[in-house]
């Protein structure tokens, strides 16, 4: 394979047949990629295109995530091109030392699917080291008696390179007395020896300087030098001689320090001091020590086979005359099973998807034992019962894969322990543990803690208050288990849902957006959803039923008698001869609440004459408790309170004005001075009534003038007979007999009352009529009628107000019993406001009914004009027919024509009230 991008550099090309057979017997080796590169390549240099050599396209690189798994980061893979690049310094001598072959082996890891490939990069040596001597100069003593041909061992140079780039030869500077001889050891290394060419004469030259040069075989060759200083000494004829040139011994690596390795021995044939031999290492050793007298070599430190398998030392023997002899000591270290196997994980997936299929690759396992032979052969096993297994991939390489289904909710993590045991005696083992976390997938939907929820909320709750909280749990983790809440549906209007309730998406709290009213909304149901944040998201629904509880938030409302603008009711008449237990009237009230909050009770708060009347606690009936006494006032006042049964109770009050009288005329003088409250909102109505009254007066004056002129032209005395006493022709209601009758011309005074309360005014006759015979002004109250304001009546003597039908009870203004009808059918009674558009029609209807006696005021005998549906459930037999006291000037035909002319409508008949009632029912 080539080293350039796109092809494998200098890889061994095996025959096709051999590759086929090799793939059958050893599939793991088929995935091994080989490269050959020189050492000391610059960082970023391209070794080869690993992606192309593995069969990956450029488009696959982002998903396959090709990378290098190695203990030391010598190489890296380009994410864009898939090229294998140099990432750190490649020093062959540092990586492999003196080994003849140097290769770096590592794994290339690819994902999706996860797999790994063996890569072998052979490092070639370059001539980057020069030969070096340990000393820049050294001294050598040679006796002048030394014979020509005597050899002296010189210092050896070192070259870290191997092969041709290593040390190849030595050279010596020219000197006629010396020559250089190069010898080779058994391991192929060369060392120099200095040979004496002729006898030295100390007296002529006692000191010689030579230069020794060491050269390697590179191109160009590199060299190193040292200075050789030779001192000529006096004669010492015999040098020491070792009994062996090379000493060899084997030593176990576990021997303790101080163990004797061997003993070297040398002899010298001289005598005296020249025969005394001193032993020393040619180079200072740190592992072994040498006894200078005995030549015994002992261990100084603990030996380690894995660090150095053999030692080679040079021992010198020097006699007293300075002659030196050398021998070589070679110590071979024998391996012991003293290293446990080492287990390391590569490309470990710490997070495993819980839906991973069996056989998914989890990690690569590397086993390394520094021992050799059987001591370095390792067996790997997986401890415990876990859903994983290990598969042997190649020598000392294994795969950790899944061997079953995973469920994070049951077991979120696994503690995987792998034990490696060698085959030594005794065997050594080591274990490594790793925690594998299971990554969650969204396989669990949220689950509510209850199948359904039911809450009760009292009405009038503050807006924004929490009314309920639902909770759902999800067994998943992270976003898969993060639950958010929402309102999916309800039985409320979709557009109005947001104005009623809202829900916190995080806490599941349901908030009320408004104050609930029990009288409007008593219950509603929501469909809530809990949804996780997984992809795809899972959800669950639950129903929440909200019951709105009633509170006593509605005070009783008095329907009958209705309250006036001043908060009091108009008066009722009681016969003077009423016996105890006589039903005077009935207070009718309703309460919009329910239950005890709507259970009404009636109480007398204040009475002008205590003990004269009694009030039914539950019925509200006002009855006479005793007969009217002489000292009792004719006018009585009762302040009635209506309370409900709530806690605390709410109440409403009504004031009853009761008048003891047998006829209406008896109480007229008392009520004439009754002040009429003003209503600022009726100013516009007042002006309309005044304008209408002026038009009516002008019309009536024209009619009267026409009648007077006609009578004056007539010669018949009978035409003036109506002005005689006791003879008066009347049209419409009958005037009471105590009215003055005569043939005098009529005189009219206009009673103008405030339009807000007295829209219907009656005319008052001339001064011949007594004060007790004053005509009443109409009131819309439906009970008795207050008199007109005297100041107003005198200020407009020329005006006459038209008749009004508002003094009659309408269908919606008649009171009913408590609880007899709903709130929609019970309007305020009486209604003091009138519709200006129907004013003329009401006047005509009133005039017609007054003329023919069909007014609803007398619709039933003794019922005060109340219908059977809405009237109080009692009769007032004692109340006189006060319609005979109401006098409306003008004939029915005249009023009808006038009304029709004004309105452009047909004349109104006596059934005008029925039409009005029918119109309301149609609404």
Curated annotation (Swiss-Prot):
Membrane topology term: Single-pass type I membrane protein
Residue ranges annotated as Cytoplasmic topological domain: 709-923
Any one Pfam family match given in the protein's UniProt record, by short name: Cadherin_C_2
Signal peptide range in chain numbering: 1-30
CDD domains referenced in this protein's UniProt entry, alphabetically: Cadherin_repeat
Disulfide bridge partners, by residue number: none
Any one biological process term the GO annotation gives: cell adhesion
One Gene Ontology molecular-function label: calcium ion binding
Annotated Cadherin domain residues: 31-133, 134-242, 243-343, 344-448, 449-558, 566-671
UniProt key word Signal: yes
GO cellular component: extracellular exosome; plasma membrane
Start-end of Basic residues biased regions: 913-923
Major localisation: membrane
Alphabetically ordered keywords of this record: Calcium, Cell adhesion, Cell membrane, Glycoprotein, Membrane, Repeat, Signal, Transmembrane, Transmembrane helix
Extracellular side: 31-687
Glycosylation sites: 415, 541
Transmembrane segments: 688-708
Polar residues compositional bias, start-end: 807-832
Function: Potential calcium-dependent cell-adhesion protein. May be involved in the establishment and maintenance of specific neuronal connections in the brain.
PANTHER family, per the entry: CADHERIN-87A, PROTOCADHERIN GAMMA-B3-RELATED
UniProt protein name: Protocadherin gamma-B5
Native source species: Homo sapiens
Gene name of the record: PCDHGB5
């Amino acid at each position: 394979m080539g080293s350039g991008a796109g092809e494998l550099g200098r890889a061994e090309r095996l025959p096709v047949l051999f590759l086929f057979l090799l793939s059958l017997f050893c599939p793991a080796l088929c995935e091994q990629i080989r490269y050959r590169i020189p050492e000391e390549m610059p960082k970023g240099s391209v070794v080869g295109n690993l992606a192309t050599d593995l069969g990956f396209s450029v488009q696959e690189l982002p998903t396959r995530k090709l990378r290098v798994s190695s203990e030391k980061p010598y190489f890296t893979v380009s994410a864009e091109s898939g090229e294998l690049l140099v990432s750190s310094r490649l020093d062959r001598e540092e990586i492999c030392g003196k080994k003849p072959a140097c290769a770096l082996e590592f794994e290339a890891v690819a994902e999706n699917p996860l797999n790994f490939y063996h890569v072998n990069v052979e490092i070639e040596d370059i001539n980057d080291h020069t030969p070096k001597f340990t000393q820049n100069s050294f001294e050598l003593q040679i006796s002048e008696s030394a014979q020509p041909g005597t050899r002296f061992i010189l210092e050896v140079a070192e070259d870290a390179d191997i092969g041709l780039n290593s040390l190849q030869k030595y050279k010596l500077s020219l000197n006629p007395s010396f020559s250089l001889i190069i010898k080779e050891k058994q391991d192929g290394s060369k060392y120099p020896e200095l040979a004496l060419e002729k006898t030295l004469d100390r007296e002529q030259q006692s000191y010689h300087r030579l230069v020794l040069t060491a050269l390697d075989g590179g191109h160009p060759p590199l060299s190193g030098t040292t200075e050789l200083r030779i001192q000529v000494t006096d004669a010492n004829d015999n040098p020491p001689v070792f009994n062996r040139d090379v000493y060899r011994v084997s030593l176990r690596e576990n021997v303790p320090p101080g163990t004797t390795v061997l003993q070297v021995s040398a002899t010298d044939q001289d005598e005296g001091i020249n025969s005394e031999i001193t032993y020393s290492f040619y180079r200072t050793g740190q592992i072994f020590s040498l006894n200078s007298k005995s030549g015994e070599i002992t261990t100084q430190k603990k030996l380690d086979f894995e660090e150095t398998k053999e030692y080679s030392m040079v021992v010198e023997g020097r006699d007293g005359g300075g002659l030196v002899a050398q021998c070589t000591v070679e110590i071979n270290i024998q391996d012991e099973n003293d290293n446990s196997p080492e287990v390391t994980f590569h490309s470990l997936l710490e997070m495993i998807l819980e839906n991973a299929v069996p056989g998914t690759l989890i990690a690569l396992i590397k086993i390394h034992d520094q021992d050799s032979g059987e001591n370095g052969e390792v067996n790997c096993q997986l401890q415990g019962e876990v859903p994983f297994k290990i598969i042997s991939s190649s020598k000392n390489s294994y795969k950790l894969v899944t061997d079953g289904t995973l469920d994070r909710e049951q077991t979120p993590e696994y503690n995987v322990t792998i034990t490696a045991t060698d085959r030594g005696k005794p065997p050594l083992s080591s274990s490594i543990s790793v925690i594998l976390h299971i990554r969650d997938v969204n396989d669990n939907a949220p689950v509510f803690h209850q199948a359904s929820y039911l809450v009760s909320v009292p009405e009038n709750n503050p807006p924004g208050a929490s009314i309920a909280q639902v909770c759902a749990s999800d067994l998943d983790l992270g976003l898969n288990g993060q639950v958010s809440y929402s309102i999916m549906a309800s039985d409320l209007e979709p557009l109005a849902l947001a104005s009623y309730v809202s829900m916190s998406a995080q806490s599941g709290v349901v908030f009320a957006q408004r104050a609930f009213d029990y009288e409007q909304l008593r219950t509603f149901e929501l469909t809530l959803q809990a949804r996780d944040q997984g992809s795809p998201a899972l959800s669950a629904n639950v129903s929440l039923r909200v019951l709105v509880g009633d509170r006593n938030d509605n005070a009783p409302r008095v329907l009958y008698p209705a309250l006036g603008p001043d908060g009091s009711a108009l008066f009722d008449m009681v016969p003077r001869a009423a016996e105890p237990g006589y039903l005077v009237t009935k207070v009718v009230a309703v309460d919009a609440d329910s239950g005890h909050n709507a259970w009404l009770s009636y109480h007398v708060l204040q009475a002008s004459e205590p003990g004269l009347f009694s009030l039914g606690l539950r019925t509200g009936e006002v009855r006479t408790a005793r007969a009217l006494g002489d000292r009792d006032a004719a006018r009585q006042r009762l302040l009635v309170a209506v309370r409900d049964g709530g806690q605390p109770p709410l109440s409403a009050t009504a004031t009853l004005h009761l008048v003891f009288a047998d006829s209406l005329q008896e109480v007229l003088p008392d009520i004439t001075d009754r002040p009429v409250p003003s209503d600022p909102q009726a100013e516009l109505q007042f002006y309309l009534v005044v304008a209408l009254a002026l038009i009516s007066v002008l019309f009536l004056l024209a009619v009267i003038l026409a009648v007077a002129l006609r009578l004056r032209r007539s010669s018949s005395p009978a035409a003036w007979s109506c002005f005689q006493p006791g003879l008066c022709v009347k049209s419409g209601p009958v005037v009471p007999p105590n009215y003055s009758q005569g043939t005098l011309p009529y005189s009219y005074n206009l009673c103008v009352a405030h339009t807000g309360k007295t829209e219907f005014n009656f005319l008052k006759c001339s001064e011949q009529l007594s004060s007790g015979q004053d005509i009443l002004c109409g009131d819309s109250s439906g009970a008795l009628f207050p008199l007109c304001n005297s100041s107003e009546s005198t200020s407009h003597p020329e005006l006459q107000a038209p008749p009004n039908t508002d003094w009659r009870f309408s269908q919606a203004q008649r009171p009913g019993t408590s609880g007899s009808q709903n709130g929609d059918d019970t309007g305020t009674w009486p209604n003091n406001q009138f519709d200006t558009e129907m004013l003329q029609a009401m006047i005509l209807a009133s005039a017609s009914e007054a003329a023919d006696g069909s007014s609803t005021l007398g619709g039933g005998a003794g019922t005060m004009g109340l219908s059977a549906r809405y009237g109080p459930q009692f009769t007032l037999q004692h109340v006189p027919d006060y319609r005979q006291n109401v006098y409306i000037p003008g004939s029915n035909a005249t009023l009808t024509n006038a009304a029709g002319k004004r309105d452009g409508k047909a004349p109104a008949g006596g059934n005008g009230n029925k039409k009005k009632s029918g119109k309301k029912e149609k609404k």
